[in-house]
Amino acid sequence: MTTRHTQTRDGRIAIRRDGARLAHARARARFEWLLLARGRPSKLYGYTSRHRGERIHLPWPRYWCLELHPDPYRDARSATVWGHRWGWPPTHVRPRSVQDCALDSSLYVCCGYGEKLQPVGFVSSYLTHSPLDTLRVLLVGRDGAVYVHHMRAARLCRLASNVTEFARRGLQRDPVAYEEDLELPDRRMCGTNVRHLFDVIAAAADEHDLLTVGGLCQTHAGVSCELLETVRDPWTAVPGVRMTLTVARAQYRLWPDARRQLRLHLYAGHPLGPWIVCAVLSRERETQTPSPPIGSGGVILGNVPTPGPREVETAWVIVTVAGPLLSFWPDNGKICRLANSFAALWRMGPRAMRGHWTYSAPGRHLPGDAWPLCEHVRPPVGKLPRQRAYLD
């Protein structure tokens, strides 16, 4: 006997997970008012004004909520000491203000020219009643994407591409929530000696000693470890990528054109300071190959894409003197922020390679694409600066 909630298949009863679907539907219903931002984010101002002070529970993490407010920046300026008053969010971004924010937080905060995000309230916790809770603001773009802005650190993080994704994930793509609000374990899979070597390299990077990092990578080139990657929730991990120590000269021989592309991103006088290539991240992925057309004599599989041969995705790990780790793809020239430090990379894994934590300007790039650090402060294409900004 089968009912609406059960189905019989191969002699077994498969129970539908209506509970999870119902929970997601309820979470999406709580944030349906965010759909007013489609095409005109200013419509949210009237809604947040009428419902000012209301708290909406976030799907993740637990005990976190969104407190609606029509103008959260005004109250934050009056209640706290905010050093980035002229840095963000303006209607038009000037290179000088972007560089100032980058020098202080080691991260570019950039918004497209003429593009303005609409703030809807503060992101805070039920358990902690601290003035620092008012320094996180939730914003919505014209395309419906949801962002969180950390005013103290001058960070802008893309949380979701639409309301449905935000109702399912919450703050899962916020690196600050992963690094500070969760006690994640070390996700390295390697021996004791290799783990100690990577700990020594991480300690040298924390002390901004790039010469020591380069010397250790050159001496122990080829040593590798497996990094686990989180899926679905912060505590479920699967094998992600293999991190192998290397030197820049060896990679430049394999990718002759990548050196010039990298120097276009990290030029002399960059706010992140000098940098060095220390390791390579390699990940295997399947390619989708279309089936042969009907009548071609090949095997007919419904003319749908089938899994093809596996190829290796390669990315360089770049250590900067300012602290953060960057990831650079030598085949296409993309670059993004990988982690704040090696310790954060050990805990969070290489999720940034999939575009989860790329910091993008709204309306310019598709969600998941790696975005350059900042387009407004790039040097003009032509002769590269003579000043040396990297360590080979």
UniProtKB/Swiss-Prot annotation:
This protein's record includes keyword Iron: no
Family: Belongs to the Roseolovirus DR6 family.
Keyword RNA-binding in annotation: no
Gene this protein is translated from: DR6
Organism: Human herpesvirus 6B (strain Z29) (HHV-6 variant B)
Lineage: Viruses, Duplodnaviria, Heunggongvirae, Peploviricota, Herviviricetes
Localisation: Host nucleus
Protein's name in the database: G2/M cell-cycle inhibitor DR6
Recorded GO CC terms: host cell nucleus
Stated role: Inhibits the host G2/M cell-cycle progression in a p53-independent manner.
Keywords, comma-separated and alphabetical: Host nucleus
Domain notes: The N-terminus is involved in nuclear targeting.
